[in-house]
Amino acid sequence: MKTNYSNLETQALAKHIRISASKVRRVINEIRGRLYEQAPMILEFMLYRACYPVSQLLSLAAANASHNLGLNKADSVTSEVKVDEGTMLKRFEPRAQGRGYPIHKPTSHITIVIKKKST
């Protein structure tokens, strides 16, 4: 029996990244559906703070694909890239007359799925 490697995929997940999900979305929209060889170059020249954790996660997903499935990095494509909102860190900032204003610090969960490029 032959194993069909065309539909196999692997993923990498980063949770509780201390950056807003909307700021990460503008970065991951640029690499969705791209070849793995193109995606790190795109992230390198974008000037956003969210590029660093996304590029780390992308290299981790490629390492998972090469180790677990034996995929070549040249044959890999980012099939699914998504970001979800994580838990909100809630803090209070001291204000005048003994009051405190709530401060919400957002987190996000980033998922990158890599599969073999369809020929």
Curated annotation (Swiss-Prot):
Subunit structure and binding partners: Part of the 50S ribosomal subunit.
Superkingdom in the source lineage: Eukaryota
Protein name stated in the entry: Large ribosomal subunit protein uL22c
Origin species: Anthoceros angustus (Hornwort)
Functional description taken from the UniProt entry: This protein binds specifically to 23S rRNA. The globular domain of the protein is located near the polypeptide exit tunnel on the outside of the subunit, while an extended beta-hairpin is found that lines the wall of the exit tunnel in the center of the 70S ribosome.
Entries under PROSITE patterns matching the protein: RIBOSOMAL_L22 (PS00464)
GO BP of this protein: translation
Cell location: Plastid, Chloroplast
Keywords: Chloroplast, Plastid, Ribonucleoprotein, Ribosomal protein, RNA-binding, rRNA-binding
GO molecular function: rRNA binding; structural constituent of ribosome
A Gene Ontology cellular-component term: large ribosomal subunit
Chief location: plastid
Family: Belongs to the universal ribosomal protein uL22 family.
